[in-house]
């Protein structure tokens, strides 16, 4: 049976809540898709480009500002989750440990998590923590979309070369992993991101018989 094609309007996305840890999140139901990445990978900027809302997700020149788990509702039962950024050295150690704990708990215990978008600066892809995140997602049998962000910083030739390198480097993970080039500034890859999210959200509409 062919899966129905759905097309969600991400421009209607609204902020739902922030939580310091999994215990303060809403009920674990519907479908959630998480956005994860290093503190300077441009997660908030990517979310704002997807939703066409300049300030939906708070951005800052200071990496590491996203200290909470932030939830956004696209439609009832369909949520995007902006996870705390990882790997920023200038953050106090105690705060870093708190973030890592919140991140780990969410990823391990949230049943409605259906996919992970891992964002990496195209100029510095596949750092150790990025690879750990990919490894975890694959072991949890979750599909992964790797977004190579800030693509406007490179020429098209350099972008394609990096994407090819990343595609080759992830083969040993043997998971459901897709690589896309992304630029919030030039709107490169926004449609591919929304199409992937649509496919991950689709089961909720099948359940509801829509």
UniProtKB/Swiss-Prot annotation:
Its cofactor is Mg(2+). GO terms for cellular component: cytosol. GO terms for molecular function: GTP binding; metal ion binding. Gene3D superfamilies: P-loop containing nucleotide triphosphate hydrolases. Keywords: Cell cycle, Cell division, GTP-binding, Magnesium, Metal-binding, Nucleotide-binding, Septation. InterPro entries: G_ENGB_dom, GTP-bd, GTP-bd_ribosome_bio_YsxC, P-loop_NTPase. It comes from Haemophilus ducreyi (strain 35000HP / ATCC 700724). Mg(2+) binds at residues 44, 66. It holds the Pfam family MMR_HSR1. Belongs to the TRAFAC class TrmE-Era-EngA-EngB-Septin-like GTPase superfamily. EngB GTPase family. HAMAP family: GTPase_EngB (MF_00321). Residues 29-203 form the EngB-type G domain. GO terms for biological process: division septum assembly. It comes from the Bacteria. This is Probable GTP-binding protein EngB. GTP binds at residues 37-44, 64-68, 82-85, 149-152, 181-184. PANTHER family: ENGB-TYPE G DOMAIN-CONTAINING PROTEIN (PTHR11649:SF13), MSS1/TRME-RELATED GTP-BINDING PROTEIN (PTHR11649). Necessary for normal cell division and for the maintenance of normal septation. Signal peptide: none annotated.
């Amino acid at each position: 049976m062919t899966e129905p094609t759905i097309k969600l309007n991400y421009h209607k996305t609204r902020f739902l809540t922030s939580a310091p840890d999994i215990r303060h999140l809403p009920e674990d139901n519907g479908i959630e898709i998480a956005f994860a990445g290093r503190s300077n990978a441009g997660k908030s900027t990517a979310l704002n480009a997807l939703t066409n809302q300049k300030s939906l997700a708070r951005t800052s020149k200071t990496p590491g500002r996203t200290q909470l788990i932030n939830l956004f509702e696209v439609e009832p039962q369909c949520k995007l989750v902006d996870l705390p950024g990882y790997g920023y050295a200038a953050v106090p150690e105690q705060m870093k440990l708190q973030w890592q704990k919140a991140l780990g708990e969410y990823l391990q215990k949230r049943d409605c998590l259906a996919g992970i978008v891992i964002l990496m600066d195209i100029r510095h892809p596949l750092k150790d923590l990025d690879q750990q995140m990919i490894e975890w997602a694959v072991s949890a049998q979750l599909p992964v979309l790797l977004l190579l962000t800030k693509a406007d910083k490179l020429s098209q030739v350099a972008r394609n070369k990096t994407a090819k390198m990343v595609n080759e480097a992830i083969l040993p993970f043997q998971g459901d992993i897709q690589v896309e080039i992304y630029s919030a500034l030039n709107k490169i890859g926004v449609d591919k991101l929304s199409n992937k999210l649509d496919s991950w959200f689709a089961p909720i509409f099948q359940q509801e018989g829509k």
